[in-house]
Amino acid sequence: MALNQRFLNKVVIVTGAAQGIGRGVALQVANEGAQVVLADLSDYVDETLAEIKAKQGDAITVKANLETFAGAQAVVEKALEVYGRIDVLINNVGGAIWMKPFEEFSEEEIIKEVNRSLFPTLWCCRAVLPEMIKNQK
């Protein structure tokens, strides 16, 4: 258990929790006492869950396409079903699909990049906002 318990008994949604920064953030907030909702489309999110559980942490996974509002709503609904509230949303999902100079991107590739990196943040904020306003978070 970490000395810093700033997330003790807080329900925290972490998007993009399967890999990279999102995985690291999820592990850290769990280590600091959070009840973590691990949101990702990838099956690798199960590995993040297993690591948290191995350290006696409290977490669930929600596999959802966060490029859609329905996917974001599914994450919020599951968090509320299991934990009854949401205290913190950490929007992390996104990242480059193609690594090349921007001038080489086609219009379709730019649209896919925006869909992957911008819309998940917007949809998750929109989905969680009514609950956070209600609970003055």
Question: At which residue positions do the language-model features occur?
Answer:
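Conserved NAD(P)H cofactor-binding loop of Rossmann-fold oxidoreductase domains
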Residues: 93-98
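The beta1-alpha1 cofactor-binding region of Rossmann-like NAD(H)/NADP(H)-dependent oxidoreductases
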Residues: 63-75, 107
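Catalytic Tyr-X3-Lys loop
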Residues: 103-123, 137
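Active-site loop of short-chain dehydrogenase/reductase
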Residues: 10, 57-58, 85-86, 132-137
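Hydrophobic positions on the long internal alpha-helix
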Residues: 75, 90, 120, 124-128
